[in-house]
Amino acid sequence: MASYPGHQHASAFDQAARSRGHSNRRTALRPRRQQEATEVRPEQKMPTLLRVYIDGPHGMGKTTTTQLLVALGSRDDIVYVPEPMTYWRVLGASETIANIYTTQHRLDQGEISAGDAAVVMTSAQITIGMPYAVTDAVLAPHIGGEAGSSHAPPPALTLIFDRHPIAALLCYPAARYLMGSMTPQAVLAFVALIPPTLPGTNIVLGALPEDRHIDRLAKRQRPGERLDLAMLAAIRRVYGLLANTVRYLQGGGSWREDWGQLSGTAVPPQGAEPQSNAGPRPHIGDTLFTLFRAPELLAPNGDLYNVFAWALDVLAKRLRPMHVFILDYDQSPAGCRDALLQLTSGMIQTHVTTPGSIPTICDLARTFAREMGEAN
């Protein structure tokens, strides 16, 4: 049998989990799918890959937690894909993050119009999203079906991503819409560009009390950032709605069937922290769909124009297959790391598609980090 890079070290990450007493307890929004086949397909003979996307509002402690987790494994069996800070600051445009915060500040101060702000924000968000979208496209041919057995061996490779493409193509545009600096039409344009959800997409969202979140955000130093409490509230709201939306869709919810339950065009109030799969299916009014009952998107008869309805169909199709986990960040960095490690034991692996996929994926991830990571 051929040897793949990472096989000789594949148990290092798993051993770290066992040494901390972590079980295979599932805390995702959707139960693990059992796909026990009577015949072994050729794909099932390939090594497996675990992809983990650490996402959620900025300033919770995602990067610190991820770096501590990565340090537990060997260089060969776990690879970190950081935020593409160099692309945002240099390669794609000049100081994109600073431009976004400055534009919002100028809008809030009445120095520019909402229309002018929307032009800048939309352009900047394209720059933010490009590295995520293109990396997902390059990775996609190597992702096979989900390894559904609950007794799957440790993966040959674990990829830890600092955010999924939906952060740049859905969540932050939606938050900017709530802030008045992006149009709902632009948000749905980004939604239409969200890549198809690959099998084994494990997304970790975060929970942290707002006062603790503000304190952490105030203490961190990121190039170009401002402490914008209104934006923090908006992005927390959006990620809460995202978690609800996945639960709603996986619970059988249909936005088209339930659209009539939405009334008016009011933005939903601030919700609670994202929840796991406990409790009943959320109401459509507590999901992202409620954001798009906006006058700009409605025909004279009150229905959505078809082009915008199709975009919401895309949104539902992209979010429904995701495996969403909730990490409690209201603990020490080491505690967050250990909690994240425990979550990984219940995540969904995928088979790769070719014998050369594992080294190719490693090279892709390291090239991304080397060329676009913050160290540059």
Swiss-Prot record:
Used in molecular biology as a selectable marker to identify transfected eukaryotic cells. Used in cancer suicide gene therapy to selectively kill transformed cells. Phosphorylates and thereby activates certain drugs like acyclovir (ACV), valacyclovir, and famciclovir to a toxic form, that leads to successful suppression of the infection, while the uninfected cell does not have this ability because it lacks TK. Mutations in thymidine kinase may induce HSV resistance to antiviral therapies in immunocompromised patients. The most frequently observed resistant strains are unable to express TK and are avirulent in animal models of disease. It catalyses: thymidine + ATP = dTMP + ADP + H(+). Substrate binds at residues 101, 125, 222. ATP binds at residues 56-63, 216. It is an enzyme of class 2 (transferase). Belongs to the herpesviridae thymidine kinase family. Residues 33-44 have a biased composition (Basic and acidic residues). Keywords: ATP-binding, DNA synthesis, Early protein, Kinase, Nucleotide-binding, Transferase. It holds the Pfam family Herpes_TK. The active site is at 83 (proton acceptor). Residues 1-44, 260-280 are annotated as: Disordered. It comes from the Viruses. Catalyzes the transfer of the gamma-phospho group of ATP to thymidine to generate dTMP in the salvage pathway of pyrimidine synthesis. The dTMP serves as a substrate for DNA polymerase during viral DNA replication. Allows the virus to be reactivated and to grow in non-proliferative cells lacking a high concentration of phosphorylated nucleic acid precursors. Residues 19-32 have a biased composition (Basic residues). GO terms for molecular function: ATP binding; thymidine kinase activity. Its EC number is 2.7.1.21. GO terms for biological process: DNA biosynthetic process; TMP biosynthetic process. This is Thymidine kinase. InterPro entries: Herpes_TK, P-loop_NTPase. Homodimer.
